[in-house]
């Protein structure tokens, strides 16, 4: 080195101090940048989590809508015949009444009675095929969901609160009540 290029000890010390002063300022800038980067990464992670949650909620909602729609379609198929079935019940009742009132001792009516019996049986088979069940048993506990009590009668032959007599049969369609059975209910003798 030439004498011009050589620095005095004071110059060297001041230059080193400047470098040391620059380093803390640079270090502070790096620290601020690192903090800002960490803050932005946290915000990004939070936004990504929020988006994931929103996506999962949307998927769950779509699945719920799909399930509800399937149930609605299934119910529509199951109970599409409800009105028609309700209109068919008086026909069943009339055929049963015709058989009850027919004079079975009259040989001239035998063929007609057999025809009504066959018609009633085939109609009952068809309605069962489509999910219509008859509610008309006696000696069963009274159930207000399927029975309508028309009268209470004392009876020693029947347990209390049991169906003694069916005045009009009831019907259900796939478990849903179309018409309650009109019944006489037993009560204990006083």
Swiss-Prot record:
Cited PROSITE patterns: GRPE
Any one of the GO BP annotations: protein folding
Localisation per UniProt entry: Cytoplasm
The keyword Cytoplasm belongs to this UniProt entry's keyword annotation: yes
Keywords: Chaperone, Cytoplasm, Stress response
Pfam family, one: GrpE
GO cellular component, one term: cytosol
Entries under InterPro entries matching the protein: GrpE (IPR000740), GrpE_coiled_coil (IPR013805), GrpE_head (IPR009012)
UniProt region (Disordered), positions on chain: 1-30
Single GO term (MF): protein-folding chaperone binding
UniProt key word Cytoplasm: yes
Cited function: Participates actively in the response to hyperosmotic and heat shock by preventing the aggregation of stress-denatured proteins, in association with DnaK and GrpE. It is the nucleotide exchange factor for DnaK and may function as a thermosensor. Unfolded proteins bind initially to DnaJ; upon interaction with the DnaJ-bound protein, DnaK hydrolyzes its bound ATP, resulting in the formation of a stable complex. GrpE releases ADP from DnaK; ATP binding to DnaK triggers the release of the substrate protein, thus completing the reaction cycle.
NCBIfam families found in the cross-reference section: PRK14140.1, PRK14150.1
Complexes and interactors: Homodimer.
Membership in a protein family: Belongs to the GrpE family.
Protein name as it appears in the record: Protein GrpE
Gene that encodes it: grpE
